[in-house]
Amino acid sequence: MKAWPKVPLGELLRRSDETAVLDPESEYHEVTIKLWGKGVVSRGKVCGNDVVSVRRVVRANQLILSKIDARNGAIGLVPPELDGAIVSNDFPSFDFRAPDECSVAFIGWLVRSSPFVELCKAASEGTTNRVRIKEERFLDQQIALPPLAEQQAIVARLDALAEKTRQVEAHLDAVERDAEHLLALRFRDAVADAPLRPMAEVAPLVRREQSIDLEGRYPELGIRSFGKGTFHKPPLSGSEVGTKRLYRIEPGDLLFSNVFAWEGAIAIAKPEDAGRFGSHRFITCHANTELTTAEFLRYYFLTDEGLLKIGDASPGGAGRNRTLGLDKLMAIEVPMPSLAVQQTFDRLQAEIAALKAKHTAIREANAALLPATLERVFAGSQ
């Protein structure tokens, strides 16, 4: 970065104090600001009659920040769709004094950079959990401001980069949608006219109860909802386990959370899950390898039809009141094409899983590209 002249923010910004005059019968967007430069968004609409404290109006292209979280990157430009939205005094907004000298879009990019977040930290003070930005100190902070033509060139470059990263994400999303659609079609073909067999026959319940040593440690396993797999919980000491029963989990087990299976808390234990334990809330099934595979069953139970059957076997209200019954699970009939057909489908599942793993790495690199570029462009901007 060239040695751009430094300018106090107070020379570029002017506090906006447009008081909101609310119609009791009208609805108004309220504003919130995501952390780490992720944008200014609506937190929902509120009826004017329900607003009991003073509110201010914000306008498109104003700079707005959170007094509490500006030091965590909660700062940005008000988007056009939130013109006329309302905020509390915890969200000061600022007009630009001279847009023909200071590009609004340039500042919009600058405030998303880590150097600017450091500037906000320097303008904040207070004790733990009460740290807030001080507006006067904020406006006294200086930024390096290039000539307008250079500002516009930087904005064009960053806009182009942002669009490219968006296109990469959109392409990966489209490829994965196509892959999931292909998988669904292949599964439909695989189970067409397949006989139904009960879970008790194809993947019976297995319980490996663990004896508890008070001096021992027992790492637990968790299951994410919506088919998101397993995760590791911190280990429990024997004394923490107390009288609770723990059951050993082995790789390849088909796992159900008895309280959240109805929302897709169904997974297969991975090799890295070996040596972990589940409570009585875990239902562990072992696929009969002469008839089926855990991967095929998992896919089925995460389809609309499979989840409907799990829901029917989980009576009760919402949340933890919906408990999957063991006998009801074992009675569920699942489609059983030939083992060869299931294995062919599983190979396709594995190929798509590998594709998604590659995409994850690409997404991570893509997500890091813009922040790294902002860091490079605005290094020394304070």
Q: Residue ranges of each PLM-predicted region?
A:
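Sequence-specific dsDNA recognition surfaces
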Residues: 7-21, 31-60, 200-211, 216-251
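Short Gly/aromatic-enriched secondary-structure transition segments
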Residues: 26-27, 78, 216-217, 269
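A structural connector/turn signal
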Residues: 47, 52-53, 81, 128, ...
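A short beta-sheet element
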Residues: 55-56, 60-116, 251, 255-306, ...
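A short glycine-rich beta-alpha junction/loop motif
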Residues: 71, 85-92, 125-149, 276-282, ...
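Disulfide-stabilized, aromatic/cysteine-rich ligand-recognition loop
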Residues: 312
